UniProtKB/Swiss-Prot annotation:
InterPro entries with a match to the protein in the record: HemC (IPR000860), Porphobilin_deaminase_cofac_BS (IPR022419), Porphobilin_deaminase_N (IPR022417), Porphobilinogen_deaminase_C (IPR022418), Porphobilinogen_deaminase_C_sf (IPR036803)
Cofactor(s) this protein requires: dipyrromethane
Function: Tetrapolymerization of the monopyrrole PBG into the hydroxymethylbilane pre-uroporphyrinogen in several discrete steps.
CDD domains attached to this UniProt entry: PBP2_EcHMBS_like
Protein's recorded name: Porphobilinogen deaminase
PROSITE patterns associated with the record: PORPHOBILINOGEN_DEAM
NCBIfam families in UniProt: hemC
Organism field: Alcanivorax borkumensis (strain ATCC 700651 / DSM 11573 / NCIMB 13689 / SK2)
Subunit record text: Monomer.
């Protein structure tokens, strides 16, 4: 193997560093003599915490500056949370690998209460996600949902300071950071359908960089790939960004994909759902079919109105 050093562009949050170090360790264990270095980047999305993501460019902010590091030669690959990766990559980039998925569910976190149903009338729930907000309000219209941004530790600190009665985070992030004990309740998909790609880590590189793609290929998990492809195909057909109340979650069992999709009003007053199955090799077609079902129910009206307000 001719390459001796591979550089990973990563956000500088603890969870992003965990994900990059996971890839670093896997690559170094697979390829003797390869040294993998981390290039830490504090993105605009990490710096601007007092404004909703939708108003400053969406979650693509977390990806764009890592791509710039690859383009100008500071890094060879970038490691992302798949739920942050835009549906369309810019020209010149490829996403050849999706690693094995961690728990994709949302986690209910509280120091006092055991779940949404146990919260008192008018309790305050924190989340940065319109998808979570919509589903919380659909289940409990009486609750107050306020924006909560920052890394995992920052969000937990705001809960502990008494700013919220409960917060909702991705279970995967808490588990990767060995904070399992903070999870009071893992929310089933029926209560809070996860974000597209939630819990999965993707690796991006320059298009046509075959030597790098060859190094990365053993990290790809085909089951996770097939599930996330179906979820992202649905989101792409809906023309959904990362900061919209869209959920998509695929399971794989006995060679069959089962995809559930959701589009909702921000306030939870209207929730559209669709689901279907297909053989695992037809995930993209399944995703489009579920999106078409949602559009037939009026998803486009909900999304157009949302974009007009943002």
């Amino acid at each position: 193997m001719s390459r001796e050093i591979l550089r990973i562009a990563t956000r500088s949050s603890p969870l992003a560093i965990w994900q990059a170090e996971y890839v670093q360790q896997r690559l170094e264990s697979l390829h003797e003599g390869l040294r993998v270095e981390l290039v830490r980047i504090k993105t605009q999305g990490d710096k601007i915490l007092d404004t909703p993501l939708a108003k400053i460019g969406g979650k693509g902010l977390f990806v764009k500056e890592l791509e710039e590091a690859m383009m100008d030669g500071r890094a060879d690959i970038a490691v992302h949370s798949m739920k942050d990766v835009p549906m369309e990559l810019p020209p010149g980039f490829a996403l050849p690998v999706i690693c094995e998925r961690e728990d994709p569910r949302d986690a209910f976190v509280s120091n006092t209460f055991d779940g949404l149903s146990s919260l008192p009338h008018g309790a305050c729930v924190g989340t940065s996600s319109l998808r979570r907000q919509a589903q919380v309000k659909a289940n409990r219209p009486d609750l107050v949902v306020n924006s909560l941004r920052g890394n995992v530790q920052t969000r937990l600190g705001k809960l502990d300071a008494g700013n919220f009665d409960a917060i909702i985070l991705a279970a995967a992030g808490l588990k990767r950071l060995e904070m399992h004990d903070r999870i009071r309740y893992e929310m089933p998909p029926e209560e809070s359908l996860p974000a597209v790609g939630q819990g999965a880590v993707g690796i991006e590189c320059r298009e046509g960089d075959e030597s790098t793609i060859e190094l990365l290929s053993p990290l790809s998990d085909v089951d996770t790939w097939d599930r996330v492809v179906a979820e992202r195909a649905m989101n792409r057909r809906l023309e959904g960004g990362c900061q919209v109340p869209i959920a998509g979650f695929a399971l794989l069992e006995d060679g069959q994909l089962w995809l559930r999709g959701l589009v909702a009003e921000e306030d939870g007053s209207r929730v559209l759902r669709a689901e279907g199955t297909a053989p695992r090799g037809q995930g993209a077609e399944l995703g489009i079919d579920i999106a078409e079902q949602l559009l037939a129910q009026g998803a486009d009206e909900i999304l157009k109105a949302l974009y007009a307000r943002q």
